[in-house]
Amino acid sequence: MSNPRKRSIPMRDSNTGLEQLLAEDSFDESDFSEIDDSDNFSDSALEADKIRPLSHLESDGKSSTSSDSGRSMKWSARAMIPRQRYDFTGTPGRKVDVSDITDPLQYFELFFTEELVSKITRETNAQAALLASKPPGPKGFSRMDKWKDTDNDELKVFFAVMLLQGIVQKPELEMFWSTRPLLDTPYLRQIMTGERFLLLFRCLHFVNNSSISAGQSKAQISLQKIKPVFDFLVNKFSTVYTPNRNIAVDESLMLFKGPLAMKQYLPTKRVRFGLKLYVLCESQSGYVWNALVHTGPGMNLKDSADGLKSSRIVLTLVNDLLGQGYCVFLDNFNISPMLFRELHQNRTDAVGTARLNRKQIPNDLKKRIAKGTTVARFCGELMALKWCDGKEVTMLSTFHNDTVIEVNNRNGKKTKRPRVIVDYNENMGAVDSADQMLTSYPSERKRHKVWYKKFFHHLLHITVLNSYILFKKDNPEHTMSHINFRLALIERMLEKHHKPGQQHLRGRPCSDDVTPLRLSGRHFPKSIPATSGKQNPTGRCKICCSQYDKDGKKIRKETRYFCAECDVPLCVVPCFEIYHTKKNY
């Protein structure tokens, strides 16, 4: 039966050769333009000895069967075995040491390591050499003539600028370097010229094209352009941190409207067209622990008992967590009774919404029920429950019973709902929550004509989100918001990796290129002289007051000393030295 919820975008001829796919890297001078410089399940929900009778529960005592290619599952109105969860034996938490848990950069570098940046640097320089070897354009010159090989430090500054552009948003990339008063961002010009940024963006590359093998589907060939980076980051996500007991598997979509063999359509998502990911998140925090890119047929997936691709995707994502008592929450696209049974046999609980047209769903549940009623059927460790509250919802669970509890609805009024529904709502939204946190920092720009560069931008944002989640777990008393964490991370990246004067602007130098007075001459600290109103006056330290505290608020610190030559209040140690030796402090 066709799936009305998800359908693929019609693709071009599947016989397109490898050369055509690699042609996306062809150099186009039009790419440049002139720049104007917890696990809160209640034990009462798991009453294993008996099921509490409910007046509105339909229990006719009859049994129901469902067939599946000759095999059948016998469902009954009463649980034949105790309903209980597996003991959780996992060891959740961060697995890699951090020397300073208050430093956002150290969390980011848990994932974005020197090894990864070195690989990107190597491939970017190789791509630049390839582009520079091509004949110049119609005007007789190429902007690649101005290329100089990049290094790890410059690329990290480049990534910091990309992150900053997600916060300080402008409709056109060139506007970040415009000198028009309405658009001026002078600090960005101090960090990197627009021309250099565009050159780096044009040459940004992640894999040698000659290593991309043919003989696969178009989608799989395309994915190889970013696959080493994707695999590296996903591996880091899963080795740096182990999630808590409750996890969720769902689909995520990265917006992309250009031609792409992997492009999908998901009408239920906020972004409906683009690159589809299958994501495993920690339910409590939204930490992205594992992910797969949808490439259609030929995906490297684990086998499943029912043979369904959706089941194979789930088993692939949770494979390293099996046997430890985890509980995975799933949406109806990924659910079948046989998948739940297979997970349960691997000491993993499962909860999720189910489609009535799935095989092995009890026939009793396919009948309509009245609003406010609940009907449940049991088969071994499985429970299938149907509940109607305006709309009919069917649930599967390996440990819930048909307990109904009282909760507050959106209007604050008391209402009754099955416990399985309540637990599902509390734990299933992790992937959508992570997507929502990323929407404030969009990577969608007209410059992203090449899909894998946009996907890299998306992976960069996911890495920052995971870094923030770990930071919050290690600093529960901190009130630093996601936006302030990003700002602090960008500041630390620039402080550590930016080399003043590394890239110069074209034409006449602006005042930013002139060595400031504070970096030359003779400077000595002196006490701020007394005034008629104050015997011991103080001033705000220039360095301290430019920093932020652990809560993301600006620091205010008074000092008795100042530089007489610069007439600037400064703490003697260490701010006086910093102010007179660092161009960007």
From Swiss-Prot:
Residues 1-73 are annotated as: Disordered. Pfam families: DDE_Tnp_1_7 (PF13843), zf-Tnp_2 (PF13842). InterPro entries: PGBD (IPR029526), PGBD4_Znf_C (IPR032718). This is PiggyBac transposable element-derived protein 4. Residues 62-72 have a biased composition (Low complexity). It comes from the Eukaryota. Residues 47-61 have a biased composition (Basic and acidic residues). Signal peptide: none annotated. Residues 25-40 have a biased composition (Acidic residues).
